[in-house]
Amino acid sequence: DAQKDAAISGWSMSGYDPKNWKPASQIELASTAFLDKNLDYGQLKITGQLDDRVQVRKVLQAQSIQEPRKGVFIYDMGQNMVGFPKIFIPNGKAGQVITLRYAELLYPDLAEYASQKGMIMLENFRAALAQDIYVLKGGDEYIQPRFTFHGYRYLEITGLAQAPALAQVAGIVLSSISEISSSYDTSDPMVNKLWNNITWSMRGNFLSIPTDTPARNERMGWSGDINV
C-alpha cells in the first residue's frame, strides 16, 4: 500500500518524531513438526547469511500487449525471465488497487479452452499464488515489487482503465550469477540455441542458492540432484 509511504516519510533522519508508531507485538514461539520444543527469543541468535547476492542482470522491455477481456491487459516480455516488473503509472488515482499476475504460458487456441482464449495459464504453477497487489498513492509512480521474484513471460495487469504503454512496462531480470565461465559454439544453430536456453535457465535458478524452479510452488533450495 503506497499510501502508507507518507506515514514514514523521513523516518531515517534525525529529529523524526515516531509518536504515531505502535510498538511491535511479541508472538509466542510454538513448537513445530521440525522442532519439538518451545523456545523463547533469548535462545535465538541472528546470524548473517553468507551467499552470492542477487543482482539485476538485465532489463527486458515488453514486446506486445493484448486485451483478451475488458480491463485485462497482458504483456509479453518476449521470453521467460526471473525477476519482477517495473511499471510506470502516470497520473494514478490514490487508493486505486492494481493486481499483477504472472504466467509462463497463455491458454492455447483450442476448443476446450475457448472461454479462456488469450488469458494467462496458471495450471502449471500448481498452488503458487503468482500475484502482487499494489495500492497507488496517487500521481506519477512506479510499481516495482520488493522482496519477491517471479518466473514468467506474461504479465497480466488489472485495475487500470487504460493499459500502460509498452515503453512503460519493463522486466527486471535477477540472478546471483554474474558471468558464465564457459562457452559452447557449434555449426548447428539449434544446438547453440539449446546451450543459450540452458545457461539462461541456470541463471534464473541461482538466487543466492541453487533453486529447483522460480515459478511454481516449489521455489526451494536444489542442492542434491543438481550435483549428481
Feature map (PLM): residue ranges:
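Extracellular/oxidizing-compartment recognition motifs
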Residues: 1-217, 221-225
